[in-house]
Amino acid sequence: MSTAIAQQKIRIRLKAFDRRMLDLSCDKIIETADNTAATAIGPIPLPTKRKIYCVLRSPHVDKDSREHFETRTHRRIIDIYNPSAKTIDALMKLDLPSGVDIEVKL
C-alpha cells in the first residue's frame, strides 16, 4: 500500500501579444520562486493562437482589393511546487508589465 504525499502547486498561465515581454515576465516569476526556495517548472510554451482579420482596402467599391492583419497570442505555463507563504507574498508584490495577462490557480 503506497501513500502519495500531496504536493501543493501553483499554476501560472501567462498570455501576451509580445513574445519578448512574455519571456521577461516568465524569467522574473521563476527567479522569484527560486529565491524563496520553491521549485519552479517551466516556462512551458503552449501553442500560439493566430487571429487573422480581413479588411477591404477601398472605402467604396473594388472588393478584390483586401488587406490582412493578424494578432498572435503567445502563451506559457509555469508550475511552482511546494510554495511557502514567503513565495506567495513575493509573487503578489512582483511588478510585471501591463501587456501580460496572468492567471493564477492554487
Swiss-Prot record:
The protein's matches in NCBIfam families, at most eight in alphabetical order, are given as: PRK00596.1 (NF001861), rpsJ_bact (TIGR01049)
HAMAP family per UniProt: Ribosomal_uS10
- The protein here is known as Small ribosomal subunit protein uS10
Task: Describe the function of this protein.
Answer: Involved in the binding of tRNA to the ribosomes.
Keyword Secreted (UniProt): no
Instruction: Extract the signal peptide range.
Output: none
What gene does this protein come from?
rpsJ
Q: Which GO terms describe its molecular function?
A: structural constituent of ribosome; tRNA binding
BP GO annotations: translation
Q: Which GO terms describe its cellular component?
A: ribonucleoprotein complex; ribosome
